[in-house]
A protein has these predicted regions:
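PP2C/PPM-type serine/threonine phosphatase catalytic domain
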Residues: 1-177
Length: 177
């Protein structure tokens, strides 16, 4: 999450938070959200993992020449990622791996991104090479006229999987309103 936050904070600095800057950011995220933005998030995550590893070295993570086996180190820190930026004019949703990002109203629970579904426990992870290639993202304009209550929910796949049916999961999401 910190990697997503740090990258998004930098994008907001570059583009600016005024109307023109956010308009340009929407355009960029629509075109590059699941590629360039995803690459930046993965690079930030790897830099943080390396920094943590240098502070807290783990035995067995070097080869016979003493070179660090980064894929093995990354797998120690492997995780999926859900992130969201909410502005007055748009919502940007970003995901690598499993989980759910949805908009919830009293009438519906609508996914904002459609990640690849897996059977069993297999999933995409930041620890895998080229994890950014598996990122999914969406930009949705916000409708400001609606007076109806709504919320966004970001959850691990364990939340949805803990219900006996999708209907039960959706009912619980609506109950949070």
């Amino acid at each position: 999450v910190n990697s997503f936050y740090e990258v998004m904070k930098n994008y907001l600095k570059v583009y600016g938070e005024d109307e023109a800057g956010l308009s340009n950011l929407i355009t960029f995220l629509n075109r590059e959200g699941d590629m360039r933005f995803a690459q930046d998030v993965c690079e930030e995550w790897q830099a943080r993992v390396k920094q943590s590893f240098y502070k807290n070295k783990v035995d067995g993570m070097t080869d016979e020449k003493g070179k660090i086996k980064w894929p093995s180190v990354f797998s120690l820190y492997g995780t999926t990622l859900l992130g969201m930026l909410i502005t007055d004019s748009f919502v940007f949703s970003f995901q690598i791996g499993d989980g759910d990002i949805s908009a919830v109203t009293k009438d519906a629970v609508e996914p904002l991104v459609e990640p690849e579904k897996f059977l069993g426990t297999e999933t995409h992870s930041l620890s895998k090479p080229d994890a950014w290639r598996k990122a999914v993202a969406s930009v949705r304009r916000r409708e400001m006229e609606s007076e109806e209550p709504y919320m966004y929910i970001l959850s691990t796949d364990g939340f949805a999987n803990s219900y006996t049916s999708d209907e039960e999961y959706q009912k619980t999401c609506k109950d949070y309103l």
